[in-house]
Curated annotation (Swiss-Prot):
It is an enzyme of class 3 (hydrolase). PROSITE patterns: DS_RBD (PS50137), RNASE_3_1 (PS00517), RNASE_3_2 (PS50142). Disulfide bonds: none annotated. Digests double-stranded RNA. Involved in the processing of primary rRNA transcript to yield the immediate precursors to the large and small rRNAs (23S and 16S). Processes some mRNAs, and tRNAs when they are encoded in the rRNA operon. Processes pre-crRNA and tracrRNA of type II CRISPR loci if present in the organism. This is Ribonuclease 3.
Length: 272
């Protein structure tokens, strides 16, 4: 296959940078002070202003010469930097986790709701640059606008301070706010995952049934089966019923994710 989009020479188009010194729009003193506390001393102040510029400014009247740039491009870059650095952190912290668990945990950290919460704590909404005709108060508290601003800020830090600077910011203001152990516990709560799976597919809730209960009171063994829509999904065996249910749900999730089970939307013939 011919990859025609690849450059024939690595130097073509390289080294293009924006000239912050020629910028007509810089940061106001309060925002500059706030960003310095969060990121260290900015070198390219224009790029941080762009990171905080909401797309609503594009609807204002500007001459072509002085037309501002919104934070959407920086948001794209920051999203990739966040994914990379959060992925690396989880990869190192949890050497026993497989790709699926790592991806799931990363998604919990970098989803829009989480990013907006981080941005709110960093008071980014108060420093957003918003179009004159836009609803400023609504945008300053908007989940989407806050998440976009955080991603754009990460992109700006990356361009201004490099990967090391972006990593410092993410470590101090994102990772430090996440209880990774609770995150992993939630990931390994297979009963919760199974409920989420059935709810997302408009299926009946999972049903757990004790198949056998053997042994004396202090040394019992439970065998629990979980089913959905009359179809058995998995079994678990453990000294505690709660643990047996988790193991049954774990087997069910493994089979569901591997496509080992049929269509759960069709009730089992025995229940028809």
């Amino acid at each position: 296959m011919s990859l025609q989009f690849l450059r024939s020479e690595a130097s073509d188009g390289a080294g293009e940078t924006s000239d912050a010194s020629s910028a007509d729009f810089l940061l106001d003193p309060q925002t500059a002070t706030h960003l310095a506390r969060l990121t260290g001393r900015p070198c390219n102040r224009l790029i941080y202003r762009t990171a905080l510029t909401h797309r609503s400014v594009l609807h204002d009247h500007h001459s072509e010469e002085h037309k501002p740039e919104s934070n959407q491009r920086l948001e794209f870059l920051g999203d990739a930097v966040l994914d990379l650095l959060i992925s690396e952190h989880l990869f190192k912290q949890f050497p026993g986790s497989d790709e699926g668990h790592l991806s799931s945990n990363r998604a919990k950290i970098v989803n829009r709701k989480s990013l907006a919460a981080f941005a709110l704590e960093l008071q980014l909404g108060e420093h957003l640059i918003i179009g004159e005709s836009a609803d400023k108060q609504k945008i300053r508290t908007s989940e989407s606008a806050l998440a976009d601003a955080l991603e754009a800020l990460v992109g700006a830090i990356y361009l201004d301070q490099g990967l090391a600077g972006a990593e410092r910011f993410i470590t101090n203001h994102v990772i430090a706010k996440v209880d990774l152990h609770k995150l992993v516990e939630a990931e390994y709560n297979y009963k919760s995952r199974l409920i989420e799976y059935t709810q997302s597919r408009q299926l009946p809730p999972p049903l757990y049934t004790v198949i056998t209960e053997e042994g004396a009171e202090h040394e019992k063994t439970f065998v629990v089966e979980v089913s959905c829509n009359g179809q058995p999904l998995g079994r678990g065996t453990a000294p505690r019923k709660k643990d047996a249910e988790q193991l049954a749900a774990k087997e069910a999730m493994k089979r569901l994710e591997s496509g080992d089970l049929g269509n759960l939307n069709e009730p089992s013939p025995q229940n028809s």
